[in-house]
Amino acid sequence: MSTWLLPENIADVLPSEARKIEELRRRLLDRFRSYGYEMVMPPLLEYLESLLTSGGADLRLRTFKLVDQLSGRTLGLRADITPQVARIDAHLLNRQGVTRLCYAGHVMHTRPRGLHATREQIQIGAEIYGHAGLEADLEIQQLMLDALHLAGLSRIRLDLGHAGVLAALLARDAQAAERGESLYDALSGKDVPLLNELTDDLGADTRAALRALPHLYGDASVLAEARTRLPVLPEITRALDDLAQLAAQAKGAEVAIDLGDLRGYAYHSGAMFSAYIDGVPNAIARGGRYDHVGQAYGRARPATGFSLDLRELARISPVEARGTAILAPWAQDDALSAAVAALRDAGEVVIQALPGHDHVLDEFACDRSLVERNGAWVVEPR
């Protein structure tokens, strides 16, 4: 076996791609900071039980597992950073009131999300803890859209759903609640025949409401239809009101409501949102409310946030990250060294051509040269 081969769906990141990823990472983290989010850096490796406090069976399947040679306990390579940030908020920071946190780091998946997807993503995201009101969801939604616009994306479609609708329907019907997992599978897969079979012997109101969910999809006007087809329950009314406000405040995106989209239902407790663009089949960013995420760490707090994969974002972003640079000669010259140092201190990229290598690879656009004129080193256009 060749020593240079990598595992399936694992790849090196070469300079041009790495430069673009880093450019986007900096842009997004700077934007998060402008909203008041503080950076945290959780470890790549944790005890398995700490990583699997939420996310259900899917997260367990996606998590690499290994044995700690020091303790003998099972460790996991993180597949999602969100539970780690919840642990930090609940156990380490232990603040009262609102906490805004953001992060960027690698996550590993045992299985790729798609045929050509990588198993090593660079997850970046932001979370708000401590505020149960819709204001936090509105801020996170706007921050997610800001991040996508900073990456140069346009014609964004924002899909909105709400975990509270199905939760309210199951809470009012014990028989439906017993079939909750099967109903969730049928709704998630848009399997209408299975849904009809599962609801055939339920109460008329519950049956009609559950069967309506896959068809309650469209622009914001579908919320009016939902109010006529779903039971008048406080939880459902509140969920529809929340979605109406989220749709109205989604600046710079085309909004679609999908009350039958329950991906992440086991994880979320309120509004859910996903961002799509033309030509990309999967969501490029996902977010929503998950108030119970800190419960496993002994401190359940209201929480809402979003995340995306920087490698995928870099692949589809039109942002040009090819940097300009100054080409300088290499010489043992104090004045030259001082000029190069001053330019670098000012934020310029200065590439010194080593002896015998006067050509410079096209990774940087050397649009200027550092040349000696009348005993002084000056920058001139090339």
From Swiss-Prot:
It holds the Pfam family tRNA-synt_His. It is found in: Cytoplasm. Keywords: Amino-acid biosynthesis, Cytoplasm, Histidine biosynthesis. It comes from the Bacteria. SUPFAM superfamilies: Class II aaRS and biotin synthetases. GO terms for biological process: histidyl-tRNA aminoacylation; L-histidine biosynthetic process. Pathway: Amino-acid biosynthesis; L-histidine biosynthesis; L-histidine from 5-phospho-alpha-D-ribose 1-diphosphate: step 1/9. Its main location: cytoplasm. GO terms for cellular component: cytoplasm. Belongs to the class-II aminoacyl-tRNA synthetase family. HisZ subfamily. Heteromultimer composed of HisG and HisZ subunits. Required for the first step of histidine biosynthesis. May allow the feedback regulation of ATP phosphoribosyltransferase activity by histidine. NCBIfam families: hisZ_biosyn_reg (TIGR00443), PRK12292.1-1 (NF008935), PRK12421.1 (NF009086). This is ATP phosphoribosyltransferase regulatory subunit. It comes from Burkholderia lata (strain ATCC 17760 / DSM 23089 / LMG 22485 / NCIMB 9086 / R18194 / 383). The gene is hisZ.
